[in-house]
Amino acid sequence: MSERKPSRLALIGLVAVAVIGSAAFYLSRPGETNASEALDKAKASQKLQSLTELNGKAPDHRKLDVQTWSTAEGAKVLFVEAHELPMFDMRLIFAAGSSQDGDAPGVAVLTNAMLNEGVAGKDVGAIAQGFEGLGADFGNGAYKDMAIASLRSLSDKDKRESALKLFAEVVGKPTFPADSFARIKNQMLAGFEYQKQNPGKLASLELMNRLYGDHPYAHASDGTAKTVPAITVAQLRAFHEKAYAAGNVVIALVGDLSRAEAEAIAAQVSSALPKGPALPKIAQPVEPKASVGHIEFPSKQTNLMLAQLGIDRDDPDYAALSMGNQILGGGGFGTRLMSEVREKRGLTYGVYSGFTPMQARGPFMINLQTRAEMSEGTLKLVQDVLADYLETGPTEKELDDAKRELAGSFPLSTASNADIVGQLGAIGFYNLPLSHLEDFMQQSQALTIEQVKAAMNKHLGTDKMVIVSAGPTVPQKPLPAPTDKPSEQPLGVPEH
């Protein structure tokens, strides 16, 4: 939860979905071309458009003709034809993230990780070789709200049909072999041991626990060292049966396919999944009380995290908050936080803020690392910057610059098939209008200073913050005075 999302992609608020689950494997054989190679060759053959050529204008944005329907089993499908490359991308987004773990934290991540570990007649190695031999890429991942399985394949009928057959088996009928289950559990347990040496992770876990209490978002997606060993294969099978049901998935498809071919693919995949309805949406969290916590950790630096409940994905203030946060701390250099904390005082390498809208109210967070002996003063400085921003709002120049950056980076949201399939998946998963991207852009460009200020004050309050620090308890020093050229640069390389 403490990782920062790149500001240019946060402009849509969906690009996290466009890239998660992207871990894939492939091995090309002599004389064969795989889907990723086809994409790389196409990119290499295109002339890059330089910033000089753009002459200050935003690059062209690719408008999407989104087609949508539902399969006989209840799966929602979103499809965009794209015939430029002989390939297609498919992403299945299940409401099967860790918020559905119930009393077994970690079961969602384990279930997803086990999908490609075995099917009837094939172990994990044979599955990998099967995709590789077809020039196809498989990817999967599980998070708070969702679990994902993805396929990239050449659109040639022979390769496509074989890849789809294997993909449908992997997603719909995994066997959950015991040896793989033990291996992945051990990997997760090793990860928990590593977390003990990561103050940023420890602070993040404590922060989410304080922020969400008994809500399903409180626990880490991968569970804990206590919960994971107790999870059984029977629990994985039961979770797969209900959470990977056809009624609980959105199928996003982009590529060199006709509507008829896309319908056939969606029907094939949907029919391979367990039969069942969508799972109920999780409840909204209860507003926590403001609090301050500290984790003692031997280090030269202190991790600082501030958070409060933000918004869900349906909030009408989404565009205004995205713009407001971009100016506060969502970008790199030039944001309010970065200017005051790093550029003028040299207290950190980076300080970032962000909303994470989810099915229920996700967190708004500010996080940074700073010298331990200046941690208290730095925390107060961050709080003062936020308070001042809420009181004054953005300047006209800040708002104009943020709008210009958004307009310039907006085309990246649909620059490739992988980008598009991620956008479609998010639109379908969060039940957004098909025109969401254009709507968001229009709303953002029309924002006024007053609207941004009002939205930020409506959803944020300096008296609501949950604060967690992780680092040593040491005598504190006063902060340096602000200057255009800080005499002391940030200490060393950021830890962890």
PLM segments and residue spans:
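His/Glu-rich zincin catalytic helix
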Residues: 5-19, 23-137, 150-155, 161, ...
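Histidine-acidic residue clusters that define the catalytic metal-binding segment
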Residues: 47-69, 209-249, 277-285, 410, ...
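Short, polar/flexible loop-turn hinges at active-site or ligand-entry regions and domain interfaces
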Residues: 118-121, 171-179
